[in-house]
Amino acid sequence: MKLSIILGTRPEIIKLSPIIRALEKTNIDWHIIHTNQHYSENMDKIFFEELNLPNPKYNLNIGSGTHGEQTGKMLIEIEKVLLKEKPDVVVVQGDTNTVLAGALVASKLKIDVAHVEAGLRSFDRNMPEEINRVLTDHISSYLFAPTEIAKNNLLREGIEENKIFVVGNTIVDATLQNLKIAEKNENVRAFFNSVVIDDDYFLLTLHRAENVDNKERLKNIVEGIFEIIEIYDKAIIFSIHPRTKKRLKEFNLFDKLKSNKKIKIIEPVGYLEFLMLEKNAELILTDSGGVQEEACILKVPCITLRDNTERPETVEVGANILVGDNKEKLIKAVEIMLNKKRNWKNPFGNGKSGERIVRILTYGKY
């Protein structure tokens, strides 16, 4: 058997790392194809070194662009590699343009597609990620669903049950494995001590197009952050995405954020550093699906700055509240989460998902 693992972003590298580690213990022929979907080295390449992962066999250097431009370039370049390598299975993870392009090329070439994190649904077709994940699921031969909720989403859409495997989420494997590394790493500890001034800080991330490309919505979120500071007197560490920084400047919101003494804006950091920031935060504010999961696993209360989530399990267990861009909801949610006991059950599995996936791809069963 021969596997092509196609990835292109930081979350994909993180969530596929447990599968890669499991593959390294086998005799399976496999390789990594990296589309380089993110244009910043800080945003993805650094993770291979941090996670002790082998370098990609292929770097496609696609970079940023419109959805059509980026996906089109990927289709062309991925096809060249798959025609050369002729794998039996292509493995993709998540909901990016890399995932859709990899799955489409493989499907056209009659190569089986294995979709890790299948069945997630926000039920919002305005999100590009929703289109990517739905299309990918419907052309996949192996659908690795993280939870029963995800499996039921797939069954409702008519996908055959014998293609669906509930394996848990590889984010649990990655979080548990790499937090230990982070806590022992002197450079990570030094970074943490240099950034964190107040022990009871909130951590903020913001990058979704529906938030940062909408001036009114972004303005509402920023104003909500200022109100939280005013009411709760908390320090906020804002790990800022390049796209978000660009929009904040464009909408004349950046200088106001930067001048607030309670807000510490930091450039994108390595995965291990970010894990430490998450683990030690009093509260996390985010629009990232992966961060919602990590917060839940790490037992840190989370508030999601979106109207919906494809991680409803985090809401069901009480680890997460959705507030969208509504300031009143945000302020109320902060009060609720600051008083919440961190005793919810992790709904994403026991950290063995990577091994399960490799067993299924190898033997066709758990």
From Swiss-Prot:
Record's keyword annotation contains Cell division:
no
InterPro entries named in the record: UDP_GlcNAc_Epimerase_2_dom, WecB-like
Reaction catalysed by this enzyme: UDP-N-acetyl-alpha-D-glucosamine = UDP-N-acetyl-alpha-D-mannosamine
Q: What does the entry list under GO cellular component?
A: cytoplasm
Q: Does the keyword Electron transport apply?
A: no
Check the record and name the Pfam families matching this protein.
Epimerase_2
Q: Where in this chain does the entry annotate a coiled-coil region?
A: none
Q: Known EC number(s)?
A: 5.1.3.14
Identify the main location: cytoplasm
A GO term for molecular function: UDP-N-acetylglucosamine 2-epimerase activity
Question: What general EC class does the enzyme of this chain belong to?
Answer: isomerase
Family annotation (CDD domains): GTB_UDP-GlcNAc_2-Epimerase
- Keywords assigned by UniProt? Cytoplasm, Isomerase
**Family assignment from sequence similarity:** Belongs to the UDP-N-acetylglucosamine 2-epimerase family.
Q: PANTHER family, alphabetically? A: UDP-N-ACETYLGLUCOSAMINE 2-EPIMERASE
Summarize subunit and interaction data from the UniProt record for this chain.
Answer: Homodimer.
State the name under which the record lists this protein. UDP-N-acetylglucosamine 2-epimerase
- The organism is Methanocaldococcus jannaschii (strain ATCC 43067 / DSM 2661 / JAL-1 / JCM 10045 / NBRC 100440)
Question: Its gene?
Answer: wecB
